[in-house]
Amino acid sequence: MRLHKIFYALFENRLSDNLEELVQGKKAVESPTAFLLGGQPGSGKTSLRSAIFEETQGNVIVIDNDTFKQQHPNFDELVKLYEKDVVKHVTPYSNRMTEAIISRLSDKGYNLVIEGTGRTTDVPIQTATMLQAKGYETKMYVMAVPKINSYLGTIERYETMYADDPMTARATPKQAHDIAVKNLPTNLETLHKTGLFSDIRLYNREGVKLYSSLETPSISPKETLERELNRKISGKEIQPTLERIEQKMVQNQHQETPEFKAIQQKMESLQPPTPPIPKTPKLPGI
């Protein structure tokens, strides 16, 4: 029981510090908006913030679950125990912190950005319903990125994090990425049908808006998203990314991993075929 009280006190202290830091330079508004973000792992959801900052003139608070994972009071000990699998052991803590922060800040009416993936519909529906009860307008902005690009994005992110700190680098299994890709279009269609979101938008990595339910309310986002997820990428487009990842993996000494071998195979497949060496014609009498 005493340990529970200590943990609760540590959590409340950290929550207080997080709230104080997040509200710096931000103002509560009379008619607040919450932006829920979606997109498969590696799609680059951070880039959605640019459009939102422009829309709110920067008066918005970003709540990113990942930033709270290392705040777990036993994080260092858990890293030693579980190494790169530590994420799943600290996620319950970061989820609790995220929920507490959303609750406290929404009570006061701050504009919010809430990161997610869109793997399920339950969480966005519950969040949007709760926020609307507090007077919020709710919107959903989703990354529409070809699945090969986002999968490579998960590998590059891991290699970059590994170079910085091998013990806390966050790996995304390909299966988790592919499940998100498979479910996202249907989930987004379900969310569109609920009518909970005043606007559902799709953006690519360049920040170009590909779809808005506000502009085309009778059209589901599913078709546009599926088309972009399955869009074929040319070798010219993908080669710089492959070369960049290969270089990082060599630096991290990850040449023996299945991912490295797959990257090399893909790069080899992009090389133009070697033309056959022409045969030297035989001279008469030789």
Curated annotation (Swiss-Prot):
Note whether Chloroplast occurs among the keywords: no
Task: Give the signal peptide range.
Answer: none
Annotated family: Belongs to the zeta toxin family.
Q: What InterPro entries does this protein map onto?
A: P-loop_NTPase, Zeta_toxin_domain
Top-level class of the enzyme under EC nomenclature: transferase
Name the UniProt key words of this record, in alphabetical order.
ATP-binding, Kinase, Nucleotide-binding, Plasmid, Toxin-antitoxin system, Transferase
One Pfam family, short name please? Zeta_toxin
* Stretches the record annotates as Disordered: 249-286
- In this chain, ATP is annotated as bound at 39-46
Reaction(s) catalyzed by this protein? UDP-N-acetyl-alpha-D-glucosamine + ATP = UDP-N-acetyl-alpha-D-glucosamine 3'-phosphate + ADP + H(+)
Protein name per the record: Toxin zeta
The protein's superkingdom reads Bacteria
Q: Does the keyword Transferase apply?
A: yes
Residue ranges, compositional bias (Pro residues): 272-286
Q: What is its EC number?
A: 2.7.1.176
Query: Which GO molecular function annotations are given, in alphabetical order?
Result: ATP binding; kinase activity
